[in-house]
UniProtKB/Swiss-Prot annotation:
Main location class: nucleus
Protein name from the UniProt record: Ribosome biogenesis protein SLX9
Keyword Nucleus: yes
Its biological purpose: Involved in ribosome biogenesis. Required for normal pre-rRNA processing in internal transcribed spacer 1 (ITS1). May be involved in the movements of the replication forks.
Keywords noted in UniProt: Nucleus, Ribosome biogenesis, rRNA processing
Region of interest (Disordered), residue spans: 1-83
Family: Belongs to the SLX9 family.
Skewed-composition ranges (Basic residues): 1-18
Superkingdom of source: Eukaryota
Species per Swiss-Prot/TrEMBL record: Eremothecium gossypii (strain ATCC 10895 / CBS 109.51 / FGSC 9923 / NRRL Y-1056) (Yeast)
Taxonomic classification: Eukaryota, Fungi, Dikarya, Ascomycota, Saccharomycotina
Length: 188
């Protein structure tokens, strides 16, 4: 038997490949609608590679700090925070500029009269006989919170006691509206 030439065999193989690739191109199917429904599974080897790669990246990032220790970085951050905080001198100058504080002849700073004065309260210790000056705010300390059940209960009992005191007051019997007005002013 006579052997065929290699060139003829190569040409024949090339023709067959072309025909098969053309057939494959014409037989393309539409994309699978369920292709993205399943979660991609990562093999054990891929997981190990991902972990090692992330660890190496983290090491490179830490090495990129220029050899600065953690404590030095912490001190830098703390210093930057302190620089951002307002200083009392800055606050004083801004209050002067806004007109909230004015200097007297003696050189001391005094609040302008338009600013509300804050006074401490002595709570529910009886009725206040004198009305306070206008523009004051009472600070009530150690009062129960109305938001809690126990606090609301305590506040209602205190209010009931105060109500009975107001009603039993002689001035209330003579002029109720005037007395109520004074009591409301005293609670302000």
């Amino acid at each position: 038997m006579v052997a065929k030439k290699r060139t003829q065999l190569r040409a024949k193989a090339m023709r067959q490949r072309r025909n098969s690739s053309e057939a494959m191109e014409t037989e393309e199917l539409p994309p699978d609608p369920k292709a993205f429904l399943h979660q991609l599974r990562e093999s054990k080897r891929e997981k190990q590679l991902n972990r090692s790669q992330s660890f190496l990246n983290r090491l490179r990032d830490q090495a990129g700090n220029g050899g600065i220790s953690k404590s030095a970085l912490r001190r830098r951050k703390k210093r930057m925070k302190e620089e951002l905080k307002p200083r009392m001198e800055d606050l004083l100058t801004s209050l002067k500029e806004e007109g909230v504080l004015e200097e007297d002849e003696s050189g001391e700073l005094a609040a302008v009269t338009g600013v509300t004065a804050i006074t401490a309260s002595n709570g529910y210790s009886g009725l206040h006989d004198t009305a306070e000056a206008c523009g004051t705010v009472r600070i009530r300390k150690n009062e129960p919170s109305i938001r809690t059940q126990r606090g609301a209960k305590l506040l209602t009992t205190k209010e009931q006691e105060r109500f009975t005191k107001v009603i039993s007051n002689e001035r209330f019997r003579s002029s109720p509206f005037e007395t109520l007005r004074e009591i409301i002013k005293s609670r302000k």
